[in-house]
Amino acid sequence: MNSLQSLCVLCSRLSECALELECLRFCDPVTLIPDMTNFRKNGVVIIHLFKTLFAELCHQNFNCASPVTIYLQILLKAMYNQVLLLDASIHQFLLDNDKQKYFENIFQLNECKQHLKLDLALNNYLTFSVDISTINDIEKLLCKMNCIFGLISPLDGINACSQIIEFLTILCGVCVVMKPEVFSETTTCLKCYEELSLVPNQGKSIRKRLAGKFCNHLTETHMVSNLEKNVDIIEKDLDFSTKQYGLVKEYMAKITNIFQQQLYSKPPHLQEAENTLINFDLFSKIPDTIYSLSEFTYWSKISESVIQKASITLNQLNLCHSLYADLQNEISKFLYGETIQDVFNFNEENVTNDDKLYIGSRFISPCRLVDIITNVSIKNLEEDPVFTKLAEEDEIQTKIKTLLNELENSAHETVPKKYVTHSMTQDHNLQQEIHIRKKAYYQKISESGYSKVMLCIKEQEALINKLMNINILGNHIFESLSKMMNAFANRQLQSLENFSADPFTYDDHLYIKNNLLSKKLPQELLPNLSQEMYRLLTGPLSNYHTASFPLSSNISMAYACDVADFLPHMKEDLAKCVEGTIYPENWMLCTYNKFFNFDGLHNINDMQRQMWNFIRELVLSVALYNDVFGKQLSIVKFGEETETVEKILLTFDSGSPLLFKRGTTTTKFNDLYSLLYFDLKTQCDPVQISQTKQVSHIPAPNLLDLCRQNENSIPECFYNF
């Protein structure tokens, strides 16, 4: 078993223990005191694991994070805190025997720690604060950090992610089941946007398309059904003596008998149609009437499935809740000698009926309640006079009955009946035509209104399902955190002092810059260079251009901007900046040793625009340099692996933003044009230059020392000066 497998096994075992530890919070402390020895043994194991692994996990995530290690760091810290809190609360309960105070301590009701004010520092020491209170806020902050990834120093970025992990420990605790107050079901995430990007937008903006969409990525909804029918599982867990105590056996029998009767039955016309169709199979001769009957039966079943009545009534669920509560009290009397009071029934008499509607029952599946609410809403709609009239004149039901009557009447006929008649053979009846058209118009209007109401009911049903069912913490937040932390870790320059320093002066910078200013960039290069700029600007969360089925870099950047709620005018500024131009004087704006320097800027928007300008100048200047001198310099982000021998590494670090790597030698630069001069100078071979005949050269290697082939065929007027 390798280390990753061992880590996964440990994570699985800890998750199992964490679930049991979370359940203890909801129990009556009276039930915990007799078994305190086992609790403390397990607590010692958790404390030992925390002291052994936690520091190493933090170090691992600081250098090379993964979703599993981040989750383990959160889980270990939360379990450690929970064990200490439980032990202290039980000890206090033994002294004062106050359950009210015990539950207040366990659930920390007198304090609120679910808020974080995160301070984020940028490259020019500009600091701003972000308020976080939900998982959605964390995901949105990561998306915004993704857009300004180049403006955040690696150390500040990793520290911010570490604070987020600490806050997740408080927010989530030991249980992966999320509390309703720690997430917003209608706030979408990056994955929601990715799903919408796969379907046509029908001319709607992304904000309109995302409005009303339920996010099932940050928290994944798990439907709980048939919880009330699992009395047989309880019966298997009880020993024989417990089953024979008091009314335990009687209560379990009553719960089992509640759901024996099913209230729903098919409509009579549908049952009769199915009995008729059962006589026809694949090899039978199918008359037109039978085919029509089958088709109308199909559509009738579809409509019945939409308005099908629930098989369990609200009275049955209320009775089930009462019987389960009585069964719990009987079992607790046998095991502990008294009726236990867990957190669910503690002060239950103070809960109003309206509150109970939101609280629900721990013995009843949320899906059952949602189904009942939905069907009651549909039933109330169908009792409206308009829809009652429509139900009486159900066209599909009428046609099925007509076809059944025709089949019965024509059972002894030898000649099949023709169902299609020519309209010109019928007498024209104006009043009948008006009545038919009016009825068709009313039918169309009614069906349209009914469809809209049904759509609204289904949307509300989806919302209630999201709220009432179990929501498990998804892995999307851990994946995003690990990607962000690894991207910052790759940018760390631990060995920066080992790199050679820039050996050139302002004259060298000016020499390259002045010579490039007299040239023009080929127009046909601009589209590819724009993609190159988008690639360098895109953060680690939206690198779709590196996927197995890659998208273009501009789409990756567009996704990042949309998810981070970029303002439209900022998107326009970015697009105009990246468009580029063939004239160097429009983009060569950086002064000597000021590349990626943001001094004097005190606004995030201005810093973003300045970063875009720096990236544009880097990409276009290197492209022009390659075109003029026949070079093949490439630009990559620091930490990315490429097979290129000569490359420029973009570090996004204000101290040393550029590194030039040739083979195993790396030199750091604060100036772009000094870097280009370094490449040009070190490529020249003075021995070859001195042996070249019939060509006049300046002794010192410089811009004019170009290597040409067949120089003897060049007229003297081009090189004699």
Curated annotation (Swiss-Prot):
It comes from the Viruses. ATP binds at Y625, N626, D627, V628, F629, G630, K631, Q632. Keywords: ATP-binding, Host nucleus, Late protein, Metal-binding, Nucleotide-binding, Viral genome packaging, Viral release from host cell, Zinc, Zinc-finger. GO terms for cellular component: host cell nucleus. A zinc finger (C3H1-type) spans 189-217. InterPro entries: UL28/UL56 (IPR000501). GO terms for biological process: viral DNA genome packaging. GO terms for molecular function: ATP binding; zinc ion binding. It is found in: Host nucleus. Disulfide bonds: none annotated. Pfam families: PRTP (PF01366). HAMAP family: HSV_TRM1 (MF_04014). Component of the molecular motor that translocates viral genomic DNA in empty capsid during DNA packaging. Forms a tripartite terminase complex together with TRM2 and TRM3 in the host cytoplasm. Once the complex reaches the host nucleus, it interacts with the capsid portal vertex. This portal forms a ring in which genomic DNA is translocated into the capsid. TRM1 carries an endonuclease activity that plays an important role for the cleavage of concatemeric viral DNA into unit length genomes. Associates with TRM2 and TRM3 to form the tripartite terminase complex. Interacts with portal protein. Belongs to the herpesviridae TRM1 protein family. This is Tripartite terminase subunit 1.
